[in-house]
């Protein structure tokens, strides 16, 4: 049975940035405008210009091009090209943690680092020190080693969820507001495809700012 996903090739139409310059090593950006009705319906309600989504073991980047045309481009299948168990993708100055298997909440997909976490002194210092966020492939939620070991020295304030931020689990049901790691103080927000769709019509999912 032929694959429903596009063949590999460079991203061309609608691109406003060189995403390769923002991606971690191992990510092979490939193209493909998807026309699935469910995805097309979701794109009608997107509030942001660029976002990464996970759909059945494949990664996509959604791009809003000039003229308001919205397109979904195929990035890669997480099971090939030597993609590690976990890592970071940077798009539109936002950091996404991707994982191969089920997350702590039982869903699969991408985790968006909340703005007040990715702008925290410990995260910024860890990037300055190593070039990329420090990751633990077995426990990605506790990957902020600088925050964990030099918590006070880095001047990190433990982030807390905002009342305006809502989180849905992989079934589209309300869940706890993010993943809190007692070691690192980091708060994560689940962005599986179903919760992403669910959040399009809710509050707290406008990633444009």
Swiss-Prot record:
Composition bias, Polar residues: 21-30, 132-143
Annotated spans, Disordered: 1-30, 123-143, 156-185
Top-level taxon in the UniProt lineage: Viruses
Coiled-coil region: none
A GO molecular-function descriptor: DNA binding
Record key words, sorted: Activator, DNA-binding, Transcription, Transcription regulation
Role this protein plays: Transcriptional transactivator that activates the viral internal promoter (IP), thereby enhancing its own expression. This transactivation is repressed by nuclear factor I. Also transactivates the long terminal repeat (LTR) promoter, thereby inducing structural gene expression, initiating the late phase of infection. It is therefore a key regulator of viral gene expression. It directly binds to and activates DNA target sites of viral promoters and those of distinct cellular genes. Required for viral replication.
Entry protein name: Protein Bel-1
Annotated source species: Feline foamy virus (FFV)
Gene: bel1
